[in-house]
């Protein structure tokens, strides 16, 4: 039986194999010897379109910054070799390396153009996102450059006389003898001024000065803790009251404590001076009527006389 080689029939097969080391060296040699086809920029087209991001329909489109051209990367391609069964690897046609060179160049060129278009679209999208970033907030510790040159004006309580002149409808009940208002606000007794000290924790007033100066606050504390009934809080606030219960025992206890605390003996005269100061302050600062038995006259708007005029005519 004759073999196929004896009859002279040659069978061609297509073998797909990765390029070997010798094949790569020979391919590089063929590339150096043969002239490469150079494509112009007009012939190069992007495979896919690039996305252009905009902030809105009213905002003009920002030009994308130009990026430096990246070096083209050559892809590893599998070489299709038409092999002959009875021929060796060296007897392949000479035109095939040129075709492989052209295919590799076209693939690398298209890949580079697609990469450049993708990078430009990503840069434009980043610019759009940066343009829509929220404004920076000021630092909490940063102080403003504004300098306060004028101090705020202190709110002063207006005198009742001025309020009577501005709005006479508030004080309509006038005393017939002294000509002063007889409403509850004007006839209420005026207390001595007081304030809060030590970060608004301690009350600074004339009453507290008398109690702390004569050690009466210590006596009140003892009566408060020693009382067993519910009425202990009442006479602990007024230890010198004669109308409360346990009056004799309270005075005996205060007399015994005065031997150790002689400042308790100064409490009665200090209390009398406090009442005198209250009376003087109330006499000078109370704007209302002090008459006990007097008739009340009702005034209407313009017919109401001012308190500065004295008695009614």
From Swiss-Prot:
Region of interest: Disordered: 43-152
PROSITE patterns the record matches: SPR (PS51227)
Low complexity bias (residue ranges): 106-125
Residue ranges of domain SPR in the record: 177-289
Membrane topology: Peripheral membrane protein
Domain of life of the organism encoding this protein: Eukaryota
GO biological process: bud elongation involved in lung branching; epithelial to mesenchymal transition involved in cardiac fibroblast development; ERK1 and ERK2 cascade; establishment of mitotic spindle orientation; metanephros development; negative regulation of cell population proliferation; negative regulation of epithelial to mesenchymal transition; negative regulation of ERK1 and ERK2 cascade
Intracellular or extracellular location(s): Cytoplasm; Membrane
Modified-residue entries (N-acetylmethionine), positions: 1
Biased composition regions of type Basic and acidic residues, renumbered to the chain: 69-79
Subcellular location, principal: cytoplasm
Entry keyword rRNA-binding: no
Keyword annotations of the record: Acetylation, Cytoplasm, Developmental protein, Membrane
GO cellular component terms listed in the entry, alphabetical order: cytosol; Golgi apparatus; membrane; nucleoplasm
Record flagged with keyword Acetylation: yes
Family indicated by similarity: Belongs to the sprouty family.
Function: Inhibits fibroblast growth factor (FGF)-induced retinal lens fiber differentiation, probably by inhibiting FGF-mediated phosphorylation of ERK1/2. Inhibits TGFB-induced epithelial-to-mesenchymal transition in lens epithelial cells.
Subunit structure and binding partners: Forms heterodimers with SPRY2. Interacts with TESK1. Interacts with CAV1 (via C-terminus).
Domain-level remarks: The Cys-rich domain is responsible for the localization of the protein to the membrane ruffles.
Protein's name in the database: Protein sprouty homolog 1
